[in-house]
Structures are given as structure tokens and as C-alpha cells.
């Protein structure tokens, strides 16, 4: 792959990254960053597997961000970007062995255990409000302080 293409793609996805980081998500861009985060994971974490696809832009990212207005929310927010930060994404997906790779997707962790997972097939074609409700129900069950 040419360096010009890689730089172009970095620029194209920048707003897609910023949408989440502006909402408080911490980007994990290397496998080492993922491993370090998981090693110290406490409380609840919403993991967002980001993507360039339309359902990420029109459904998943807005729903994840809006869900943070709920009364109960995760203690931590992290994101990896599928197709861009490949090693980080592979490292994070390795923490969800019971779920096939899917992007966009969201996992709610309690410590290092996946307690709720929303795969792409539950995002595509869904109304954003339905995704927010899905997350809110998981937050109610797992994120009460």
C-alpha cells in the first residue's frame, strides 16, 4: 500500500475518530494500548469497534454517543478502529472470543468480562432509538453505581 494512500485514509477517517473522542472515548490505536487497558480494566467499559461504513456513521456512533445521556453509564469509554488500527482491533476482538468479528459493534465489559454485545447485524437497519434503548437496558443492568 502506498504511503500516499495511507495518509489519505488517515485524513478521511479523522472526523469518524473525532466524533467518538469528542464524546469522551479514549482511542486505543495499538495492540499494546489494548493489552495495557485490559490489564488494568476495572468497573464497566463500553468498547466501540469503529468503522467507515454507513451504519457506523448514521446509526452506531450517534446511538453510542446519545446513550451516554442515560442515568446509568459505563465508567470508561474506549474505541478501536477496524480497518485502520488493525493490530489494536485484533487485540480487542481477541477479548471477545464468543463473538464473531463485527464492525461496527459495541461491547459492554464488566472488568474484562463481556456482559453485553451489539454486533453489526443488530445495528444495520435498526432505528438509532432502538440501539440507544438496547444500550440503556444494558447500562441499567450493569452500570449502576
Curated annotation (Swiss-Prot):
Transmembrane portions of the chain: none
The intrachain disulfides are: none
- UniProt cross-references to Gene3D superfamilies, sorted A to Z: 6.10.250.2150, Glutaredoxin
Q: Which domain of life is it from?
A: Bacteria
Q: Cite the InterPro entries for this sequence.
A: BrxB/BrxA (IPR009474)
Coiled-coil regions, chain positions = none
Q: Which residues form the signal peptide?
A: none
Record-level GO BP terms:
cell redox homeostasis
Q: Which Pfam families match?
A: Disulph_isomer
Family (UniProt)? Belongs to the bacilliredoxin family.
Q: What name does this protein carry?
A: Bacilliredoxin ABC2045
Q: State the species of origin.
A: Shouchella clausii (strain KSM-K16) (Alkalihalobacillus clausii)
- Upper taxonomic lineage: Bacteria, Bacillati, Bacillota, Bacilli, Bacillales
Amino acid at each position: 500500500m502506498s504511503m500516499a494512500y495511507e495518509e489519505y485514509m488517515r485524513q478521511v477517517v479523522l472526523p469518524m475518530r473525532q466524533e467518538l473522542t469528542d464524546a469522551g472515548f479514549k482511542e486505543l490505536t495499538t495492540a499494546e494500548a489494548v493489552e495495557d487497558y485490559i490489564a488494568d480494566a476495572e468497573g464497566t467499559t463500553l468498547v466501540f469497534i469503529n468503522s467507515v461504513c454507513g451504519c457506523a456513521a448514521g446509526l452506531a456512533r450517534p446511538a453510542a454517543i446519545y446513550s451516554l445521556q442515560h442515568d446509568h453509564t459505563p465508567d470508561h469509554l474506549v474505541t478501536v478502529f477496524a480497518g485502520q488500527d488493525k493490530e489494536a482491533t485484533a487485540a480487542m476482538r481477541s477479548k471477545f472470543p464468543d463473538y464473531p468479528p463485527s464492525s461496527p459493534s459495541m461491547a459492554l465489559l464488566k472488568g474484562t468480562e463481556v456482559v453485553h454485545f451489539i454486533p453489526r447485524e443488530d445495528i444495520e437497519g435498526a432505528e438509532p432509538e432502538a440501539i440507544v434503548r438496547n444500550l440503556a437496558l444494558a447500562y441499567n443492568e450493569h452500570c449502576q453505581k
